[in-house]
């Protein structure tokens, strides 16, 4: 049985991530809120991911904390709480914002905090969000299986949020109406 993407198409497998040697730009020098600022380091990180046969690359900030992937925002679940990195060194994406709102709507506590790779390695669930992927579950980070004692993809909270996101994106009253 495939997973459901935001477009309601079947996704064959969850994402695999590696950690890039490229660091995310420091927001003091390149504002992460400007989407198309210099993304060379994100491109180099994606090349690293491709060479490692991974879907995307986790990017760390200059202090070594998880920031985002080369193309998406990242979330993790531990003990029923949803966590995502502060948006100071990453683009505060629209999908990220919607997922945080949906979490609140379905009574899932969501916190922004500085997160280490170790916390992601030991998470119960990990997923990425973006305009193109919607909400995409992650099964491996740096070759480490997420929650190896219960490798369910997507996990319960990820699945709940994914379902809510699909409902939101299929609601005709949501978004911008395009008239042709």
Stretches found by the model and what they are:
Residues 1-180:
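Helix-start/capping segments and mature chain N-termini
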């Amino acid at each position: 049985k495939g997973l459901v993407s935001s477009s309601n198409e079947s996704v064959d497998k969850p994402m695999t991530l590696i950690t890039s040697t490229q660091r995310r730009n420091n927001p003091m020098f390149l504002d992460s809120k400007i989407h198309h600022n210099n993304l060379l380091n994100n491109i180099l990180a994606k090349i690293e991911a491709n060479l490692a046969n991974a879907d995307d690359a986790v990017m760390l900030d200059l202090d070594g904390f998880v920031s985002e992937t080369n193309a998406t925002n990242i979330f993790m679940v531990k003990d029923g709480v949803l966590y995502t990195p502060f948006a100071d060194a990453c683009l505060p994406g629209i999908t990220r914002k919607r997922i945080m709102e949906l979490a609140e709507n379905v009574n899932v506590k969501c916190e922004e905090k500085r997160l280490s790779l170790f916390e992601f390695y030991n998470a119960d669930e990990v997923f990425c969000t973006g305009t193109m992927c919607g909400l995409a579950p992650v099964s491996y980070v740096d070759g480490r299986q997420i929650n190896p004692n219960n490798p369910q993809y997507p996990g319960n909270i990820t699945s709940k949020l994914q379902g809510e996101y699909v409902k939101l994106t299929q609601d005709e009253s949501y978004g911008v109406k395009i008239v042709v």
